């Protein structure tokens, strides 16, 4: 059994990131794994689609979380701490609480989280620390790298998330060889299990 932690999941509409988690949940079952999904409350999505349906037979838990830019701003402005490492950091607490309940009831053998969104890895990190379960951290894109994020404080917050990942995760996966090589060079002294799984 595997608990998938992902921001992008139906009924969200309009993001290519949906497909990776959706297909993981679909194909893991073909390899004998039973997946469940921990995601965010759909109110945090900018757009949803009634036609975007979760997989039948896959348990989905929606934890509280909001988009700081849309739901926590006043006249278009909001404090920076509400958006670090990203605008959905309010999902962390709800995700941890809901995730611990799912671990107790669903009893997964492994945790899996995917970036983007960085908060998904924060949830995965906390759940791995609290439960002792092995954790696989998936990177659809690199996090802190040259020129991204542009804001220096946000860049540092991304780097801190990375450091949490590579100090605790049992394995990491990447969509491209370039991203894998980038992180192997950065963290090879403390982390050995790098894998590439293309989209």
Where would I find each of the regions flagged by the language model?
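Donor nucleotide-sugar binding/catalytic pocket of nucleotide-sugar-dependent glycosyltransferases
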Residues: 39, 61, 134, 144, ...
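A conserved catalytic-core segment of Leloir-type glycosyltransferases
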Residues: 37-103
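N-terminal subdomain of nucleotide-sugar transferases
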Residues: 1-64, 171, 199
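A short, histidine- and acid-enriched strand-loop-helix "catalytic/donor-clamping" loop
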Residues: 10-12, 100-101, 119, 133-153, ...
